[in-house]
């Protein structure tokens, strides 16, 4: 039977409670079987020398998710090295999990920057997007009307961005309850 799996990519420098809450919300609201955390070796939009080593970020992720059976860490991008392009990772995972249904978790900033990614049309053609909407902060319908996204989405009429609106607690709300 096909599993519902979502890829949660990022630098995770470091992973924090916000990431874990987003993953939990995705599990529940999108009825996922698994969230695959995918730390980037070198994020193309964050080529920064202040990143912790890939090994350290993988270890932090593993410690953060070890008690959650539906969370898994994949070192795929770090093992591959170099700049981590989502289109390459998605293509590899589709071949690695041919019988599963894959989704890509994107926050509002990542969704808006999607047109600047490598081969964004191919990404949209290969995988479903789980768009994170921070309660009271973001509105996915409004974001998809932004000119840069409209242009990408209108390039091919056959593309339909299938977004599951995932409502996550805002980071402001999180910070208020950390103490």
Positions of predicted regions on the chain:
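Short beta-strand/turn micro-motifs composed of small residues
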Residues: 8, 39, 106, 131-133
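Hydrophobic/aromatic beta-strand patches that form the interior of the parallel beta-sheet core
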Residues: 36, 74, 103, 130, ...
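N-terminal Rossmann-like or analogous alpha/beta NTP/dinucleotide-binding catalytic cores
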Residues: 42-128
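Short, flexible loop segments at boundaries between secondary-structure elements
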Residues: 127-142, 156-168
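Conserved small/polar residues in nucleotide/adenosyl-binding loops
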Residues: 172-179
């Amino acid at each position: 039977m096909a599993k519902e799996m979502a890829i949660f990519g990022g630098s995770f420098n470091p992973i924090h409670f916000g990431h874990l809450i987003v993953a939990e919300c995705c599990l529940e609201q999108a009825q996922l079987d698994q969230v695959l955390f995918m730390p980037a070796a070198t994020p193309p939009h964050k080529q920064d020398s202040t990143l912790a080593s890939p090994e350290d970020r993988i270890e932090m992720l593993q410690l953060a998710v070890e008690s959650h059976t539906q969370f898994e860490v994949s070192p795929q991008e770090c093992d591959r090295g170099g700049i981590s392009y989502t289109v390459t990772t998605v293509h590899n995972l589709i071949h690695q999990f041919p019988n599963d249904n894959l989704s890509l978790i994107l926050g509002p900033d990542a969704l808006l920057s999607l047109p600047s990614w490598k081969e964004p049309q191919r990404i949209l053609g290969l995988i479903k997007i789980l768009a994170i909407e921070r309660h009271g902060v973001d509105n996915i319908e409004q974001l998809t009307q932004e000119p840069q996204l409209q242009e990408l989405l209108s390039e091919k009429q056959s593309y339909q961005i299938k977004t599951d609106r995932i409502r996550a607690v805002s980071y402001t709300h999180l910070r208020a309850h950390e103490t």
